[in-house]
């Protein structure tokens, strides 16, 4: 997507100005090599603390890199390993801190009604982590808006909607090929 860039495989301890550009394919091949190593050596998702990538996240990214390298069978194999991982599953039941959430509603008549569904649970602040029961998430950002310093403490005053701020800006990307 971005064209040529250097591949640096050794730690740089002093200023360097003689970098050699690598092609996109060389970069993707290095990513593949690194991710194959990661799949082998990173912890299983159930043995990893929240917010840290596991071998499931490495497999997911590897499947995308293999698509870029036009190795579609390899991509299917890696994606299938993620899908069939016994620790992963699509959420089909309410979970987390808000599974029993009730809402009085705008026309409150004295009885609270259950509110939300599984999809709603997936994206609620402080509710989407594996520790909360979310087995669908491959890797997520850890933050807690109810904890002092646990969310956005920038100049905007601490309104942390991170899960709504990031996303693919596909309309602004240009393929160089």
Where are these regions (language model features)?
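Aromatic-anchored glycine-rich loop motif in surface-exposed flexible loops
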Residues: 1-54, 69-89
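An aromatic- and glycine-enriched ligand-binding surface/loop that stacks and positions planar moieties
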Residues: 36, 56, 62, 66-177
